[in-house]
Swiss-Prot record:
Its EC number is 2.1.1.77. Belongs to the methyltransferase superfamily. L-isoaspartyl/D-aspartyl protein methyltransferase family. Keywords: Cytoplasm, Methyltransferase, S-adenosyl-L-methionine, Transferase. GO terms for cellular component: cytoplasm. CDD domains: AdoMet_MTases. The gene is pcm. Transmembrane segments: none annotated. One of its GO terms (biological process) is methylation. The keyword Methyltransferase applies. Its main location: cytoplasm. GO terms for molecular function: protein-L-isoaspartate (D-aspartate) O-methyltransferase activity. The active site is at 60. It catalyses: [protein]-L-isoaspartate + S-adenosyl-L-methionine = [protein]-L-isoaspartate alpha-methyl ester + S-adenosyl-L-homocysteine. This is Protein-L-isoaspartate O-methyltransferase. It comes from Photobacterium profundum (strain SS9).
Length: 209
């Protein structure tokens, strides 16, 4: 397997950083990250770093992908929404873990590229949409888990409304200083847990690109 040594080394790094869920680790190990980045960065594919993917966006560092995926507490039957398809890498990881993934991307060029990559990997349990991530995907909800791959300045209420009872929202919140949060729905109440400081590109609402 190409990059086999690099993939193994990355798994060791993720475990050292506290990623413990074997299913999540196996999902990350099974996705060829080099397919989701520009060829110029392919030599960095299995380094624990974020990398540019164009349009002012990035592919998250593998640790953050692992951490956010763990926090979703997924089962195979989990109904999952991803806000911010980006390169499609996080989408591909989720697709290893659940029966179906719904993913929204506001930048058409990124959505198209992600669809092409996911098809190349024969991942057919994914539905993508060009749309405003702040609004979620109302007619496909409610969702057991929602993951947001860009930072919101404030909590998107429409996403909270699309959670099932007991559903989890994992989202970075803040402007310059951002905190990764896990929000769990309990009836009409929402329990918020601060996880750690992070740095993401901003979650842009409104007009599509």
């Amino acid at each position: 397997m190409r990059y086999a040594k690099e993939r193994h080394n990355l798994m060791v790094i993720l475990q050292r950083h506290g990623i413990r869920n074997e299913k999540v680790l196996n999902a990350i190990a099974s996705v060829p990250r080099e397919l989701f980045i520009d060829e110029a960065f392919s030599h960095q594919a299995y380094e624990n770093n974020a990398l540019p993917i164009g349009s002012g966006q990035t592919i998250s560092q593998p640790y953050i992908v692992g951490k956010m995926t763990e926090l979703l507490e997924l089962t195979a039957q989990s109904h999952v929404l991803e806000v911010g398809t980006g390169s499609g890498y996080q989408t591909a990881v989720l697709a290893q873990l659940v029966d179906h993934v719904y993913s929204v991307e506001r930048i058409k060029a990124l959505q198209w590229q992600a669809k092409r990559r996911l098809k190349q990997l024969n991942l057919h349990n994914i539905s993508t949409k060009h749309g405003d991530g702040w609004k979620g995907w109302h007619n496909k909800g409610p969702f057991d888990a929602i993951i947001v791959t860009a930072a919101a300045e404030e909590m998107p209420m429409e996403l909270l409304a699309q959670l099932t009872d007991g559903g989890r929202l994992v989202i970075p919140v803040g402007d310059d200083l951002q905190v990764l949060k896990k929000i769990t729905r309990n009836g009409e109440q929402f329990v918020s847990q601060d996880i750690e400081a992070v740095r993401f590109v901003p979650l842009v609402a409104g007009d599509l690109a």
